[in-house]
Amino acid sequence: MTGTIRTRLGDGSLVEMTTAEIRADLEAGTEIGARRSKAPQLTTAELDHLQDIFTSEARFSAVDMGDEVVLSFDGSGNLDSGTRVDELYSYQCHRGADMLELFGMDYSYKAVKTILSFEAQTMKTAQLNLIAPLQYGAMPDLGRYSMPDGPIPNWSELMPLNRIDEARDAQVAAIEHAVADMVYCAEGMWEAGADGMDFDTAGAAGDGDFLAALTAIEKIKGRHPDCGIELGMASEYVLGMHGQLEYKGRRLAGMWPAEQVKVAQEAGATMFGPAVNVNTTKSVAWNVARACTIIKPAMAVAEIPVHPNVGMGVGGVPMSPYPPADAVSRVSRALVDILRCDGL
């Protein structure tokens, strides 16, 4: 192949690259992913396979027959038309979803708590109309518990003032509120017939946010062992907003997916969703090579199903309101073929 290939950047824009340029991006992506996460680089054979995927001139790409994986969704059904139940039905019957999620538009358990009775009734109605497993999902969203929206002093304001101990204490106090709200919502949804719970974008506010999710999962599984629980991450790396928080002896700050999945399964999660954010100025090939490199070590230690996040802006999927299908299909195939993941 001597000409140029039409491919995508991380923002979804169409660009033309040569085979040599795509190969160089693949090698650069795995190199920086390995260097940052201290993981092995992808093998030559894996890079060759990715090159085949991204240099193909086909409009779509797909896994081989027999290699299909489960498609789970966080936030399926967003009132584009009709009711949320209508949207869930559309995801099940028209989009091929294997697992569905009911959610509130605020997507925060702090907000859901105030409308739990309404959400529980919607869950019950949805369960009567659907066949696919249906979970309820939202974010731990630890930041909402800080002032002015919450009762806790704002640690983001305290830290620049060098009031570090106060900032850490504030995060610990916020964790207690967040855990209570997540457990409360889970109890209501379980009674309404939910098949599971999703704690999505965990770690968005740092290690305290991640600890809140893990603690809530442990409490819920202790009460309801049959409840499915998905833990989806906010990023490939847990930020140390507190810096000293631990879960069962493991420091959370600085964790990459291989360590994240260990604490997730120890807490009782039944599915783990690693997230690797995209660089919008780099090619999709570069982003996919980096994502595969960062997630691959987690596959070797995971004892629960792993579903890499492939929403807009994560996992290699372009950051665009409507990610182009040619890019999404290549990203999906690459993650399944290289990682041998359980789903997406």
What does each model-identified segment do?
Residues 2-304, 320-344:
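Alpha/beta enzyme core
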Residues 306-320:
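Active-site pocket-lining segment
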